[in-house]
Amino acid sequence: MIPATPFLQATALACERDGRMLFENLDLHLHTGDMLQISGPNGCGKTSLLRLLCGLMQPTAGQILLDAQPLGRQPAAPGRKPLWIGHAPAIKDVLTPLENLSWLSALHQPDGADADTIATALDAVGLAGFEDVPCHTLSAGQQRRVALARLYLPGPPLWLLDEPFTALDRQGIEQLEKHLAEHCEHGGMIVMTTHHSLNRLPAGYRDLDLGQWSA
């Protein structure tokens, strides 16, 4: 049987930063249900790879296809643009969790998520009752959970996550592990970096040691 076309595919990818080649000749592909963990030593380009895959950086060489189309050549179809959550929460301090998630959800849905859907997402990450509190009053862990609440909103199938377990307590880590695995088990896809040892792995889990492609 000929395998289905990958939703995400990178071919002969290379990345240079500040005059140093981080990696080159990297091939990867992601199909429905896959979880790809990017590992490797500090400085090998893990975060840079994620930024390439979501279009925030351009590769030094190689090609990235998203949904069989060259990444960045034209806007992704509605609901197909990858959801990117970086190491920093990337929320606006002066806004409330409800307000932050309202505009962030609009990046992937024409009208964004409604207030009830956002409240349900905040409840899922343990922030019920904090919907209308300015984010600058929240702890680092709570701000991280505001960002991660995006994973509980309707959105695209592909998630790109940089150290998603940072600043979470044990209960938060266990809950997020479960949610990530279930996303893949229901046909979603994830590429992520993490120093956390995962205890729940979906059938499509793979590890990519980026150090093997260091220049």
Curated annotation (Swiss-Prot):
This is Cytochrome c biogenesis ATP-binding export protein CcmA. Belongs to the ABC transporter superfamily. CcmA exporter (TC 3.A.1.107) family. GO terms for cellular component: plasma membrane. Its main location: membrane. It catalyses: heme b(in) + ATP + H2O = heme b(out) + ADP + phosphate + H(+). Disulfide bonds: none annotated. Residues 8-215 form the ABC transporter domain. The keyword Nucleotide-binding applies. GO terms for molecular function: ABC-type heme transporter activity; ATP binding; ATP hydrolysis activity. It is a peripheral membrane protein. It is found in: Cell inner membrane. InterPro entries: AAA+_ATPase, ABC_transporter-like_ATP-bd, ABC_transporter-like_CS, ABC_transptr_haem_export_CcmA, P-loop_NTPase. Keywords: ATP-binding, Cell inner membrane, Cell membrane, Cytochrome c-type biogenesis, Membrane, Nucleotide-binding, Translocase, Transport. The complex is composed of two ATP-binding proteins (CcmA) and two transmembrane proteins (CcmB). The gene is ccmA. One of its GO terms (biological process) is cytochrome complex assembly. ATP binds at G40, P41, N42, G43, C44, G45, K46, T47. It is an enzyme of class 7 (translocase). Its EC number is 7.6.2.5. CDD domains: ABC_CcmA_heme_exporter. PROSITE patterns: ABC_TRANSPORTER_1, ABC_TRANSPORTER_2, CCMA.
